[in-house]
Amino acid sequence: MKILISTDAWHPQVNGVVRTLTSLARSASALEADIAFLTPDGFPSMALPTYPGLRIALPNRREIARRIEAAAPDAIHIATEGPVGWAVRAYCRRRKLAFTTSYTTRFPEYIEVRTRLPASVGYAVLRHFHAASSMVMVATDSLRQELGARGFRKLGFWTRGVDTDLFNPNNPVTLDLPLQIFMTMGRVAVEKK
């Protein structure tokens, strides 16, 4: 099966979406899937307002169509709700093609913190975006429940996991410390809670 995954988040960005999709690409052969990515590469871009270090693509409708048709996918998954995601969604809707989507980033809260636009507006936009999807993939049951309470439908799981090549009991990290330490790491940004 040939799967086309569109994403607005791609290298050189370092975030959960990019890491998940990169890991998926490495695992594709084990999954017996041929995965192609439609990324922001090659499109003009602009700095994201309030976050100048992050650029967003400005995709051309014809180029989106050309890339999708060149990939000739059996299935289309839209991983992000940015301009590339909206353009792929529009392509699929015009041609009455089924597609799935992912909900990974709390954009309504992100936008509210950075612009003061109420999160309720962002959720209305994202409900509209995902309503056309055959299934909205979420990583956790708590997110599924939260989105369900906010009116999102057709919610399914695409769980993550632990990279067992990096983290496994056969390769323990040994530190000479007087007690056990538990640590979590994540990106620090104003919108992160």
Model-based region annotation:
Residues P40-A71, I78, P118:
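A short, charged, and often flexible helix/loop element on the N-terminal side
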Residues A98-T100, F107-H128, V138, T164:
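Nucleotide-sugar donor phosphate/pyrophosphate-binding loop at the beta->alpha transition
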